Curated annotation (Swiss-Prot):
<dbReference type="Pfam" id="PF12276">
    <property type="entry name" value="DUF3617"/>
</dbReference>
<dbReference type="InterPro" id="IPR022061">
    <property type="entry name" value="DUF3617"/>
</dbReference>
<protein>
    <recommendedName>
        <fullName>Uncharacterized protein YtgA</fullName>
    </recommendedName>
</protein>
């Protein structure tokens, strides 16, 4: 189960960190709050996790360099790291959709992330992931709200910057 959770969490982190670059996001501290997290076994339909408004939040420091780099993420742009390839299939000033495929020996996954800009200080993100970790399969749907906290990054958020 530990391996399975790692297989779910790592791609989700990779997706959300990669995803932040694609839209024009102002530099500063951002809060990423999990609104809904649901994970099932697609074979048995067993619900492994179903949390609503979990209150789990992560602070992230979005640097000026990250803001500049965001302009490079256009439709068709692709990047690879750690056995995973992310391709941006839609990229506008208000919406980003990217697809990530990971083909590692022990873990295979396919994820789609859709980010919508609500305002200059709020984004909505939906992530859908299918993971196969050594025969243990899961399907996860996560909904995240990203909210601007301020132009200055706190110590808590600085460890999360890229």
């Amino acid at each position: 189960m530990k391996r399975l959770l790692s297989a779910i969490v790592f791609p989700a982190m990779f997706i959300s960190i990669s995803n932040v670059y694609a839209l024009d996001i102002q530099p500063g501290e951002w809060k990423m709050e999990n609104i809904e997290m649901r994970t099932i076994n697609p074979d048995t339909k067993e619900v492994l996790m179903d949390e609503k408004n979990s209150g789990i939040a992560t602070l992230m420091c979005y640097t000026p360099k990250m803001s500049e780099d965001s302009k490079k993420m256009v439709k068709g742009f692709s990047t690879s790291a750690g056995g995973c390839t992310t391709t941006f299939v839609e990229s506008t000033d208000t919406k980003l959709i990217n697809e990530t495929v990971c083909n590692n020996p022990d873990v295979k996954s396919h994820s789609i992330v859709e980010t919508t800009k609500i305002s200059d200080t709020e984004f909505a993100m939906t992530m859908k992931s299918d993971v196969d970790a050594g025969g243990n399969k899961t399907t996860s749907i996560n909904k995240i709200k990203q909210t601007f906290v301020g132009k200055t990054c706190s110590e808590a958020s600085k460890g999360v910057k890229q």
